[in-house]
Amino acid sequence: MPFRVEFDPSECVACGTCAVACMDQCDTVIGVDVPCRRIVTLEDHSGGKTVIRYASVGCMHCRDPICQRVCRQGCYTVDAETGLVLLNGAACVGCGACVKACPIGAVALNSAGKASKCNGCRERLLLGLPAACERACQNQAIRFTAVESGAEDDRETVTLLSRLLGSGKGGRAC
């Protein structure tokens, strides 16, 4: 059954446990590898006062992924079983088109100059286990939710994150 990634910024307290769990799950080497999840502090200065919010940023596994559309090498596929957007890093030539296209900055080039992103803990989900970031989040700000085929898409969450991040990418949704 396909999964949808949901993120609720009102529940994120920037504790970082999701990012650490992700790094542990993926055997990320700090200072060498690009973490698949990062915590971002967001400041809103509108309305005469400063409001601080946080966002845990990682691949949202969009239903119609722009990274897949812009990749000329065909490195991205949507897994038929889980709906996760998977990356074949070995086929990547490091052009960076996907990095520039992602509206929330969830794709990065690693130290080898190849694209890198969250794999959604596919193997965990197939075993009926939560993704590492979801398991670690005490406030349940991150959820991988099983959805029926054709269920509502993820554009609302991606657009919200894009707007909150102020990425200068026009608030595009996947």
Report each predicted region and the residues it spans:
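The canonical Cys-X-X-Cys-His
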Residues: 18, 22, 71, 102
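N-terminal cysteine/histidine-rich coordination modules
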Residues: 1-11, 16, 21-42, 46-47
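A generic structural signal for alpha-helix starts
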Residues: 10-13, 17, 66, 93, ...
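Short amphipathic alpha-helical segments
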Residues: 3-5, 55, 83
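Flanking helices and flexible, charged tails adjoining ferredoxin-like Fe-S electron-transfer domains
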Residues: 31-61, 68-69, 89-174
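Ordered, amphipathic secondary-structure segments that act as subunit-interaction surfaces
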Residues: 61-84
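Aromatic-flanked redox-active Cys/Sec active sites in thiol-based oxidoreductases
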Residues: 8-9, 73, 89
